[in-house]
Design a protein with these regions (language model features):
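Conserved N-terminal structural segment that caps and organizes enzyme catalytic cores in eukaryotes
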Residues: 1-143, 147-339
Length: 339
């Protein structure tokens, strides 16, 4: 769509010369005040900007969830219908367990097979295993919305043209945090495509600025404030815990032996996140704190706190933690959003 524009690009009148945006233009969705993806300072096709695509008879999209467990909206512009199957996010883990038992040999060879978007499990088999599943037929002019972590699959009845993009309402944040934790465990289908923590921090700073300049406290602000504060406190707690572990003050999971890691304050936080900001081990994208090493490889590539001792063979004393935000900063930002 970035190259050919949205299917709604002709504007309200349908005249190509009409510059007034159609109210359903999916490029406009990324700018909506309630869409947290507007804080992602990158053009990510299909995620922050829509994809326009064509289907054909029996063209299939296998079971999958969206990146970062985001919500999505899909519009059928023209052509034949499309059948969809959906599973609510509440049954996502149950579905994953059933999928692994359906073809155990495939998962033995490739544990993250489900995330390659190449697997179909018959709806009847899912129903037999008490998994909630819904079906719909999308016709031209119909919108289909998928909710965070809702697995979905389907197929086209013939040639058709559709358009889709992701979006992130404020209620997505909690599920986005779950996605981050699963990425760190190696349960993501590919690299994280943006830094969840950067989005939350940027959104919180934006809301704080609105509070300071307008003194407004609308209902939507109260809800957003509450959700952002909760996630910021969660991030601060996790960061504080890992600081305690990596400086040798706390025993437990990840406890280090020998010299504690060095911590230093990052003076120039990158304005955007790129592939080099992904953890070289799990492909998650840390933001508040990044582990580096003095070696050439370690200076160029990041590690998340959970994988501080992976990625190169250097001695522990050469590892250091680049602090982009301190625990106190995160807690102060959260407190500034109190109503």
């Amino acid at each position: 769509a970035r190259r050919f524009q949205s299917g709604f690009a002709a504007g309200i009148s349908g005249d190509p010369e009409d510059t007034e945006k159609h109210p359903w233009d999916m490029f406009e969705l990324s700018k909506h005040p309630d869409n947290l993806l507007r804080f992602v300072d990158d053009d990510i096709p299909g995620l922050t900007t829509p994809w326009v695509y064509c289907g054909m008879l029996f063209a299939t999209f296998c079971w999958h969830v969206e990146d970062h467990y985001l919500a999505s909206v899909n519009y059928a512009h023209k052509g034949s219908a499309k059948t969809w199957y959906g599973i609510p996010g509440s049954d996502a883990e149950k579905f994953e367990a059933i999928a692994k038992t359906a073809v155990p040999s495939l998962f033995k060879e490739n544990p993250d097979k489900l995330h390659h978007i190449t697997m179909l499990v018959p709806p009847g088999q899912l129903i037999e295993n008490k998994i909630k599943i819904v079906k719909l037929v999308q016709k031209p002019g119909d919108f289909v919305v998928t909710f965070p972590r809702a697995y979905h699959s389907g197929f086209s009845h013939g040639f058709n043209v559709g358009e889709a993009v992701n979006f992130a309402p404020v209620d997505w944040i909690e599920m986005g945090r779950v996605a981050c934790r699963n990425y760190v465990k190696g349960n993501g289908k590919r690299n994280a495509v943006f830094a969840h923590d950067r989005v939350v921090v940027t959104a919180a700073k934006s809301l704080k600025k609105i509070f300071e300049t307008t003194k407004s406290r609308g209902k939507w602000m109260a809800h957003m404030s509450r959700v952002l504060r909760t996630d910021l406190e969660t991030l601060a707690d996790e960061l504080e815990n890992w600081q305690s572990i990596l400086n040798g003050k706390q025993r437990g999971d990840g406890f280090i032996k020998g010299d504690p890691l060095r911590f230093y304050k990052c003076q120039n936080i990158p304005e955007m996140d790129g592939p080099e900001d992904c953890c070289v081990v799990c492909k998650a994208m840390p933001f508040a704190a990044v582990v580096r090493c003095e070696c050439e490889f370690g200076r160029s590539f990041a590690r998340c706190l959970q994988h501080w001792n992976r990625g190169c063979d250097c001695k522990q004393r050469h590892r250091m933690v680049e602090m982009r935000m301190e625990v106190d900063e995160l807690r102060a930002l959260a407190k500034s959003l109190e109503l």
